[in-house]
A protein has these predicted regions:
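Short beta-strand/loop segment that forms part of the nucleotide-sugar
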Residues: 175-178
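Conserved N-terminal beta1-alpha1 strand-loop-helix module at the mouth
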Residues: 1-90, 95-98, 105-108, 112-113, ...
Length: 179
């Protein structure tokens, strides 16, 4: 796996009345991607951004828009976010009983596919799906709120995931760390 990395700041802490300034700060800071945290106040205890925000961002940036859905029933939001301009859509393994159908749906919408897991979810839960995804998002905090402390055991999970990807010729799969 390459040591290259992508810088993908979240707009979750941005001033939502001035997202243009947030995009400018991201660009001037060297961001490669714009990370959009989507929360539904059901899967996690917070409510954030919907497809209309992504739709308003799309004409203002050429950056890769990375949507991280922390929602129940993610299949209901895939198409709206794809149509709004998302380049990548990540869903949580814990939010669905049928990961394969969500992966296929995201791909059919022309987006890159990410799969994520909460800190206490075993890495083994996502292994059967890694051949079909473009990235794995490892949560290093409990999802739902910004400003939490990094969970140190996340380092071991990241190393374990990297080893698995390398040993299984899946080094094209990106590892994303959130938190």
């Amino acid at each position: 796996m390459s040591n290259n990395f992508k810088l993908a700041p979240s707009i979750l802490s941005a001033d939502f009345s001035d997202l243009q300034s947030a995009l400018h700060i991201c660009k001037s800071g060297g961001a490669d991607w714009i990370h959009v945290d989507v929360m539904d106040n059901q899967f996690v205890p917070n409510l954030t951004i919907g497809p209309l925000v992504v739709k308003s961002l799309r004409p203002k940036t050429r950056k890769f828009i990375d949507v991280h859905m922390m929602v129940i029933n993610p299949e209901t939001l895939v198409e709206p976010f794809a149509k709004a301009g998302a380049d990548s859509i990540t869903f949580h393994i814990e939010a669905t009983d049928d990961p394969n159908s969500i992966i296929d749906l995201i791909k059919s919408c022309g987006c890159k596919v990410g799969i994520s897991l909460k800190p206490k979810t075993p890495l083994s839960d996502i292994l059967p799906f890694l051949e079909k995804v473009d990235l794995v998002l490892v949560m290093s905090v409990e999802p739902g709120f910004g400003g939490q402390g990094f969970i140190p055991k996340s380092n071991d999970r990241i190393l374990e995931l990297k080893k698995y990807l390398n040993e299984n010729c899946l080094d094209r799969v990106l590892i994303q760390v959130d938190g």
